[in-house]
Regions:
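Active-site mouth loops of central-metabolism enzymes
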Residues: 1-4, 68-80, 119-127
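Catalytic cores of alpha/beta
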Residues: 1-11, 127-137, 179, 183-199
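Generic structural signal for hydrophobic
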Residues: 11, 59, 88, 113, ...
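Short beta-strand/loop segments at the ligand-binding rim of alpha/beta enzyme cores
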Residues: 62-72, 113-123, 169-182
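Glycine-enriched alpha-helix->loop->beta-strand junction motifs that scaffold or abut catalytic
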Residues: 15-17, 88-94, 114-120, 137-145, ...
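A C-terminal functional module that forms or caps the active site or interfaces directly
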Residues: 160-200, 204-207
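Glycine-rich phosphate-binding active-site loops on the catalytic face of alpha/beta enzymes
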Residues: 18-28, 93-97, 102-105, 144-154, ...
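Active-site-adjacent beta->alpha loops and helix N-cap segments on the catalytic face
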Residues: 26-35, 44-57, 77-83, 98-115, ...
Length: 225
């Protein structure tokens, strides 16, 4: 948590518009091998939800960029949905990406997010387009378009399919669309940004956090975009 805190406090020097902060979970279904391993290692060090809230409390008012939680629904449910959302608001979180949020829970979670003025960021893949209108109904902030079929760090879907997905989402919603999963470097990010509003890089940033720290880490991250 100490390294994460330092990273958050250095965020202003980065070119990032927003940061996803993952809460460690024992069964991270959407995460590839590398992020899952980082999650297990962090959890093994005793970093749990309360520890992350405490760290964010210490950073409050010192981070000028939005931070959203990437969190699995079981964590939210175990903590108490409203309690988790209220606490997130208190520590300065801007919204949530919940990869395994059951559709039947979406309305309640979206309602509580709205109550605390936080975003519930919808995830839509090339295979879930037929349910896009339903998913978008409860979404806010931006749309997370999944650029790969499978887990984070996977191979990207074809450019043609991705473009069609993003164009379809833009017709259905006024929310900006960012593409993640399968975006690994500056070339990928530049390509994605020709038709989407943003690019999301996860796995490669986790790799960098294992090698660098402080300002050097920020410098290396900036090279990815």
């Amino acid at each position: 948590a100490k390294a994460t805190k330092e990273f958050l406090l250095n965020l202003d020097g980065s070119c990032l518009d927003l940061l996803e902060l993952g809460i460690p979970y024992s069964d991270p279904l959407a995460d590839g091998k590398l992020i899952a391993q980082a999650s297990f290692e962090t959890a093994a060090k005793g970093v749990n939800t309360d520890a992350i809230f405490a760290m964010l409390e210490e950073c409050k008012g010192k981070i000028n960029k939005p931070v959203v939680f990437l969190v699995y629904f079981n964590i939210v449910f175990a903590y108490g949905v409203e309690r988790f959302i209220a606490r997130s608001k208190e520590v300065g979180i801007a919204g949530f990406i919940i990869p395994d949020l059951p559709f039947e829970e979406s309305e309640e979670v979206a309602g509580l997010c709205a109550k605390f003025d936080l975003d519930l960021i919808p995830l839509i893949s090339v295979t879930s387009q037929n349910r896009a209108d339903k998913i978008l109904k409860f979404g806010s902030g931006f749309v997370y378009a999944l650029g790969a079929i499978g887990v984070s760090g996977s191979q990207r879907a074809s450019e043609e399919r991705l473009k069609a997905l993003v164009e379809g989402l833009k017709k259905r919603s006024d929310l900006p669309v960012a593409v993640g999963f399968g975006v690994k470097n500056k070339n990928d990010a530049d390509e994605v940004k020709t038709y989407a509003d943003g690019a999301i890089i996860g796995t490669e940033i986790v790799k960098l956090t294992a090698k660098f720290e402080g300002e050097e880490l920020i410098k290396q991250i900036n090279k990815l975009f």
